[in-house]
């Protein structure tokens, strides 16, 4: 049960952060921010939801990192990707296949980038401590990492 709760907390926070983030980034999706009440409330809650999502994902990281270490079988799996695409058996991949392991590590990397860039652009708390060029770079990094 704790694994499922952790998973759903992460998933719920992801949806809230993604929906509000789309509303911030694309004016035509501004209506999506209503999921958090008002656009003003979405601006306040978005960073807190992001921090909760990061903390929840870090718990999952420590639970699953050892299952996601890349090994020789994963290289064999990657080299035989054509067989996998046409649904042929390649062999046992263990708990997770190479593709799933890549998604796991990409999620870790991008969540760290989202956290760091999010802290830099978080107004009114941390943004005043950074220069405008650093904030602009952090905004670009945050947008790229969210995709």
Give the predicted meaning of each segment.
Residues 1-147:
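Membrane-embedded alpha-helical bundles that constitute the cytochrome b-like, heme-associated redox core
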């Amino acid at each position: 049960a704790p694994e499922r709760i952790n998973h759903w907390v992460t998933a719920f926070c992801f949806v809230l952060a993604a929906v509000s983030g789309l509303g911030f980034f694309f004016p035509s999706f501004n209506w999506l921010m209503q999921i958090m009440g008002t656009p003003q409330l979405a601006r306040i809650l978005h960073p807190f939801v992001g921090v909760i999502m990061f903390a929840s994902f870090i718990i999952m990281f420590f639970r699953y990192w050892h299952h996601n270490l890349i090994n020789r079988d994963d290289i064999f799996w990657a080299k035989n990707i054509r067989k996998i695409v046409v649904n042929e058996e390649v062999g046992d991949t263990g708990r997770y296949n190479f593709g799933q392991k890549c998604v796991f590590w990409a999620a870790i990397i991008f969540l760290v980038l989202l956290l760091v860039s999010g802290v830099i652009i978080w107004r009114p708390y941390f943004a005043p401590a950074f220069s405008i060029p650093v904030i602009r770079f952090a905004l670009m990094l945050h947008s790229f990492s969210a995709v």
